[in-house]
Amino acid sequence: MAEEVGSGEVVARGVRAVEDLPAGLVYAGVSLGVLPAQRLAQTRPGARGAVLLEACLPAAAHGGWPAGLPVQVHGTAADPFFAGEGDLDAARALVAEADDGELVVHPGDRHLFTDRSLPSYDAAATALLTGRVLELLARV
């Protein structure tokens, strides 16, 4: 999709999608969906947190991580996109910058491991991810 419309358009569509929603949200994205989710978490007033799955941008992409904003990042250790394209390094730096940050690196090399419709689905990793995300949501 990003190749067809461009990553800027993906972000713009994500931002437009939440225009009429209340401010107090936790923003979540999977893979390419992390682009708008992370931007909204870092720039939309009233954000309550962020859950970034299988991708992460440097916090500086949107002016630094907001003080006190919880963030959770999940990905697999050898995912060619998450680990191989710099997202894991960006996630480590972001979590180090955040007051309330958690990076969960799951074993394996699968991308989109939470999508049960794909061969890359990993039920055990998805169960762990779900538990951690629910804990975060209960806190915010």
Predicted segments, located by residue:
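C-terminal catalytic histidine-bearing segment of alpha/beta-hydrolase fold enzymes
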Residues: 100-140
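Gly/Ala-rich beta-loop-alpha elbow adjacent to hydrolase catalytic centers
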Residues: 28-37
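Conserved alpha/beta-hydrolase "acid-adjacent" motif
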Residues: 80-90
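Serine-hydrolase catalytic machinery in alpha/beta-hydrolase-like enzymes
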Residues: 1-24
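Short beta-strand/loop motif that positions the catalytic acidic residue
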Residues: 73-75, 106
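Conserved serine/cysteine hydrolase catalytic core
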Residues: 59-70, 78-80, 135-138
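Short, proline-enriched alpha-helix->beta-strand connector loops that line the catalytic pocket
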Residues: 23, 65-71, 97-100
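A conserved short beta-strand
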Residues: 45-57, 70
